[in-house]
Amino acid sequence: MTATPAPRGPAPGAAPKISFVSLGCPKALVDSERILTHLRAEGYELARRHDGADVVIVNTCGFLDSAKAESLSAIGEAMAENGRVIVTGCMGAQPEEIREKYPDLLAVTGPQAYESVVAAVHEAVPPAHDPFLDLVPPQGIKLTPRHYAYLKISEGCSNRCSFCIIPSLRGNLVSRPAADVLREAEKLVKAGVKELLVVSQDTSAYGVDIRYSESPWRDRQVRAKFYDLTRELGELGAWVRLHYVYPYPHVDEVIPLMAEGKVLPYLDMPLQHASPSVLKRMRRPGNQERQLDRIRSWRQTCPDLAIRSTFIVGFPGETEAEFEELLAWLQEAKLDRVGCFEYEPVAGATANALGDPVPPAVKAERKRRFMETQNGIALRLQRAKVGKRLPVIVDSVEGGVARGRSKADAPEIDGTVHAAFRRPVRVGDIVTVKIDRAEAYDLYGSVA
């Protein structure tokens, strides 16, 4: 058994240093930012390398086996390069597997355990005696580029989808008061953030748990309700992008805000399947025929609306006929952005008891057919943009080409707009790009 690394600390007069690894979804990234903001306020500095830090924090993901493997690999790297490691995040909610492989970790905590992580850091390497609070900018420490930021409006989820263990990891829905969310958003915009990406486990359920209670914002009371919060965010002067929106009827209310230009005409809506029988086994809401009618209505109100969704193929018991239902629905819906995942069992999920697994080769073939169908849809939609002038937020500039995203593209998961330019263009600028060429995911053109 390896001996626990001896306590160490910064050189006399130097600030203690933290190295940080953040894995998983945008909600986990927000958790990481909160921890770093707290530690930075206490005088800790951020190290670029594990071997230059006094302690390493790894924020893990534990949703899928592949995510667990990535988390364990990251922990292993931190142990090898530093040896003084604190683990937190979703995988930490079930610490036995982590401790079995890495018994000498300083601490293992679950998700949202901010105070426990900070306490473990204090024990490993105490903060400076006189921390300078002005080390932290008003908007906090962000791990995203300066021009966009994730805005988490709630924790947890009260749905009980059979393939998901998020409620057991993060608990039931807990919404933030609207005024708290808006104050954070305002600080971000004042700090130069051009795009706010609203995230949670179930964005459209925001406020249900606190009965849509009001809180004071500026000169008025604002309800903790999906529409009300979206409307107020739309007044801050930044792009506002809505993620993880379930297709509830009250989502209809925000579409006019998109048509008016208050928020981006973009909905990230994880539908997961279209066959009623599969959705029933998944314990998912939604009549898919009704969803088609709703999507048509949304597009009539807001013709520029881009809809992103994710789907699972190979769910236990999925027949060829049920998969064909999904393909037919996809062709009818004509969604702009789509991701597809082969079903992967998750320890603790009730779907594991369904039996009748789909063979791996069949799952892979269905994913191929699904994406082939979607790529054809996406290419037709993209080609319709050729000749148009689109606003694009610039993410990078290199070699006379700016790469960014249109209003239809979220960072990391959607397409890229590649634009040649002659006048100066900087990261974070919002420029107009004339589109000359289209692929299924990316667009090409020049800055107008």
Swiss-Prot record:
Record-annotated TRAM domain positions: 383-448
Co-factor note (free text): Binds 2 [4Fe-4S] clusters. One cluster is coordinated with 3 cysteines and an exchangeable S-adenosyl-L-methionine.
Binding-site residues, [4Fe-4S] cluster 2: C157, C161, C164
InterPro entries: Elp3/MiaA/NifB-like_rSAM, Methylthiotransferase, Methylthiotransferase_CS, Methylthiotransferase_N, Methylthiotransferase_N_sf, NA-bd_OB-fold, Ribosomal_uS12_MeSTrfase_RimO, rSAM
Cellular localisation: Cytoplasm
Binding residue positions for [4Fe-4S] cluster 1: C25, C61, C90
Family under the similarity heading: Belongs to the methylthiotransferase family. RimO subfamily.
Primary role: Catalyzes the methylthiolation of an aspartic acid residue of ribosomal protein uS12.
Protein name per its UniProtKB record: Ribosomal protein uS12 methylthiotransferase RimO
Classification lineage: Bacteria, Pseudomonadati, Pseudomonadota, Alphaproteobacteria, Hyphomicrobiales
Recorded name of the encoding gene: rimO
